[in-house]
């Protein structure tokens, strides 16, 4: 099974490569702190932007790298502590870029600086930062919120994953076998397993664990949300506005979507009832809501077979895809193993400074699990295509990234449906 190998990136937190990258980042942020306050003409602004690009790329890459380390084993605290330190540096970076962009936003279009300065590589990030909800906050308030994020939000997020990692669920299969599952395996089972007994016993075990630790979970979620709500209050901003900004979607678009959903609730309910009847029940059990369609026989798709199918579909889109996806696996950029303490779910993490697309998931061999891989490889391919762009142009809104992944999964569905030997 494909597994992450960090030797091609920073190795470990104690490696010379990682220490060198951190030293370079700290030196750049120090230089930047002296440049930004005095950047008032095209030459000094250009120099400041050059250092901003370096800091942007390195902070994003190192934070992403530590996220990957933490996800492999959420019980390991070294990477979690390092993420806190890096977020403190990132908060300083954001204060500096906000200060500079505030100055640029105040310039008239006729100002000679715009004619003298090559700003083309920064227009995208400038538009994103200047429309962010926190852009209107005072420097002092902004600094306070970022300090709170570094000291509260990041540790709480790691605490949440650590709490999940302590779960060892005892579950049963439809064959009567008893097995033990980690939290990540439990989540994967509910989303992808064809075994109804396994889904039911997994849900029961998860529910018991959540009930036993309800106070801890509630406390963590309250801490995660609390300081953000206070920040939105400072900015006189509706709490949904940051989500709209992050996904580059308007409130009007979301309202239109929800109106369409409400108008078609009867169809959604009918689909759930129909699915329940297909399983031989009159109502849909909660542990079956994300389950794949029941089959006459349980199937297991080896990872190699799943990847071959994904590459075959991808080749229709671009002939380079098969060899590129093989490269991702060979380089150790894909992680799909079932491990104790592993973070649940799946995510894609691009390491900008190294052009490394990192795929994280837990593969169980089901069709739904293969579909999840297609989504992740879609994200990775999208990242790979942009590797020649400046780092500051590659942080696209989350909604656009999701489109790239789900488009790839749709290609997989259509291909399998077209070549299926039967309706099943």
Sequence positions of predicted segments:
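Post-HEXXH active-site segment of zinc metalloproteases
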Residues: 371-372, 383-407
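A short secondary-structure junction motif
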Residues: 224-227, 231, 271, 275, ...
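Active-site-adjacent "gating/activation" loops or surface patches in catalytic cores
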Residues: 175-191, 299-383
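Post-HExxH zinc-binding segment in Zn-dependent metallohydrolases
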Residues: 396-424
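Active-site hotspot residues in diverse enzymes, especially metal/ion-binding acidic/histidine motifs
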Residues: 242, 278, 287-288, 305-312, ...
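A well-structured
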Residues: 1-296
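Inter-helical turn/loop segments and adjacent helix faces that build the functional surface
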Residues: 251, 317-320, 384-392, 414-424
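Hydrophobic (often cysteine-bearing) scaffold residues that line and stabilize catalytic clefts
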Residues: 202, 206, 213, 257, ...
